Amino acid sequence: FLAKKVAKTVAKQAAKQGAKYIANKQTE
């Protein structure tokens, strides 16, 4: 089902953003 694929993609992007956010927090 398409929704599952979209959810997976969104989760992947969220993980990427989260990692970036954490990295930024640690470098402060």
UniProtKB/Swiss-Prot annotation:
Listed GO CC annotations: extracellular region
Modified residues (Glutamic acid 1-amide): 28
Organs and tissues of expression: Expressed by the venom gland.
BP GO terms, sorted: defense response to bacterium
Location within or outside the cell: Secreted
Top-rank taxon, per record: Eukaryota
TM region(s), chain numbering: none
Keywords: Amidation, Secreted, Toxin
Protein family: Belongs to the cationic peptide 04 (cupiennin) family. 01 subfamily.
Protein name listed in UniProt: Short cationic peptide-1c
